[in-house]
């Protein structure tokens, strides 16, 4: 299958449009179409927040499952056998033009389990696809540096539909939810931490990131959670992705990888503390974080891992660390952050860059492959979209992906919020358990703001 032959792509058409507040427009799009996305930047740091994009009704949807690719196109569905589904995607990432950012292409998510296609590792397939992308050939782009809003189209011009939606007002929805309990009890999670520490003491690994999750039964408007999350935890990577029955809502602080005009960058985050109640307390907590030898050692380890990952696909001598161990603050937590860059080697593309860093060391551990094997044995449940990546592969060869954390992953009437903590030799199990709770706090607070709980006599069965 050749996407360029099927879609008969034109040169990009770009038209400036007057717009209301971006999210207000997206509410109308979300309620009108079965599949849509909003990739939004809500951070003053322009190094992380340059553009916001939204799109609707993709040309096709592509899903990867064990052994085959599934393509939905113009009302039909086809399946193709494949050993590595990511090779199928290369036809969509052929560089075409010099435009910056996203100019149409694949928008979607990659599940954590897809790491088995990038490295020799035995991970059990999850109940989510290994990846799921919509091919979006038009959409709306917001440039936060210039304040401009543009409609971009590579095929059919659907600007009249957008113009109609601009005149509509869609009321805020309401979400109802009921907790189905956590994936691991406190006692079991503490035991997992102890076992990971034993593996570290035996020299198998230096670090492993162990996660816990809370499952929910959902009713009502999933977008209400995103609207609340925008207020509670504005972040450089805000997203709401709806592809049929699956929706992912999140506010990730962490870039997995960005490729733009052959330049590669990533921002490893490791080292976490809660926010203070006052600016003075914030500074005190940050100073304590930056003097914590355990946190500093963990961060250094993950910066080195990021440097090694980029080194696999970068021109010799181009990998640099222009920003090292700075504090980045969000609504409920503050982190230590570094910036690692490189220049893509000749013959490599955005998929090579994605494969080199996936999954992030900050959600797996070091050495990465052995850490993932230990995580698989201890957690025993596929992570699915959590700790994978969400973003775009643009038809101009660019890519931008966030790590799928600080998110609700929903399918049908069920949703899951998951968060992890990095375990090292000096970890205190109770403290790591609390760190998982702190990292999930922004999404949990947003759930409370977006709606309320409901009671039901209906039995609930967790998807395990």
Curated annotation (Swiss-Prot):
Species annotation: Methanothermobacter thermautotrophicus (strain ATCC 29096 / DSM 1053 / JCM 10044 / NBRC 100330 / Delta H)
Protein name: Anthranilate synthase component 1
Subunit structure: Heterotetramer consisting of two non-identical subunits: a beta subunit (TrpG) and a large alpha subunit (TrpE).
One Gene Ontology term of the molecular function aspect: metal ion binding
Pathway named in the protein's UniProt entry: Amino-acid biosynthesis; L-tryptophan biosynthesis; L-tryptophan from chorismate: step 1/5
Residues annotated for L-tryptophan binding in this entry: 41, 236-238
Ligand binding (chorismate): 271-272, 386, 406, 420-422
Keyword Metal-binding attached: yes
Functional description taken from the UniProt entry: Part of a heterotetrameric complex that catalyzes the two-step biosynthesis of anthranilate, an intermediate in the biosynthesis of L-tryptophan. In the first step, the glutamine-binding beta subunit (TrpG) of anthranilate synthase (AS) provides the glutamine amidotransferase activity which generates ammonia as a substrate that, along with chorismate, is used in the second step, catalyzed by the large alpha subunit of AS (TrpE) to produce anthranilate. In the absence of TrpG, TrpE can synthesize anthranilate directly from chorismate and high concentrations of ammonia.
Biological process, per Gene Ontology: L-tryptophan biosynthetic process
Gene name as annotated: trpE
């Amino acid at each position: 299958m050749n996407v360029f032959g099927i879609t008969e792509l034109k040169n990009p058409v770009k038209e400036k449009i007057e717009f209301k507040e971006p999210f207000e427009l997206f509410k109308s799009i979300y309620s009108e179409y079965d599949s849509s996305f909003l990739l939004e930047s809500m951070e003053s740091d322009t190094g992380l927040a340059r553009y916001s994009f939204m799109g609707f009704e993709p040309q096709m949807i592509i899903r990867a499952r064990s052994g085959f690719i599934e393509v939905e196109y113009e009302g039909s569905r086809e399946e193709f056998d494949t050993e590595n589904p990511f090779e199928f995607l290369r036809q969509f990432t052929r560089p075409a033009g010099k435009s910056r950012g996203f100019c149409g292409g694949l928008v979607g998510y990659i599940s954590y389990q897809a790491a088995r296609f990038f490295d020799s590792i035995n991970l059990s397939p999850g109940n989510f696809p290994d990846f799921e992308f919509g091919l979006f050939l038009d959409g709306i782009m917001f440039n936060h540096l210039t304040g401009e809003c543009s409609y971009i189209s590579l095929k059919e011009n659907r600007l009249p539909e957008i113009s109609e939606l601009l005149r509509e007002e869609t009321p805020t929805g309401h979400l109802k939810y009921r907790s189905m309990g956590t994936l691991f009890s406190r006692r079991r999670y503490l035991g997992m931490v102890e076992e990971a520490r034993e593996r570290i003491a035996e020299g198998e690994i230096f670090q492993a990131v162990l996660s816990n999750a809370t499952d929910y039964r959902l009713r009502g408007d999933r977008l209400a959670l995103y609207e609340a999350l925008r207020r509670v935890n504005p972040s450089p990577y805000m997203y709401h992705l709806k592809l049929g029955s699956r929706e992912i809502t999140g506010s990730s602080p962490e870039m997995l990888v960005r490729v733009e005009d052959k330049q590669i960058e990533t921002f490893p985050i490791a080292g976490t503390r809660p926010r203070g109640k006052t600016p003075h307390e914030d500074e005190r907590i940050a100073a304590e974080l930056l003097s914590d030898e355990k946190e500093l050692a963990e961060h250094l380890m993950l910066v080195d891992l990021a440097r090694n990952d980029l080194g696999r696909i970068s021109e010799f001598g181009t990998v640099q660390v222009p920003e090292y161990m700075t504090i980045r603050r969000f609504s409920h937590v503050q982190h230590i952050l570094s910036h690692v860059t490189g220049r893509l080697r000749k013959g490599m593309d955005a998929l090579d860059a994605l494969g080199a860093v996936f999954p992030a060391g900050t959600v797996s551990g070091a050495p990465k492959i052995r850490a993932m094997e230990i995580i698989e044995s201890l957690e025993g449940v596929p992570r699915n979209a959590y700790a994978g990546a969400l973003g775009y592969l643009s038809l101009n060869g660019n890519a931008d992906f966030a790590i799928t954390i600080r998110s609700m992953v929903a399918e049908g009437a069920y949703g899951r919020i998951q968060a992890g903590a990095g375990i090292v030799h000096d970890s205190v199990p109770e403290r790591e358990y609390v760190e998982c709770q702190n990292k999930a706090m922004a999404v949990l607070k947003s759930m409370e703001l977006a709606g309320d709980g409901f009671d039901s006599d209906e039995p609930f069965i967790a998807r395990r």
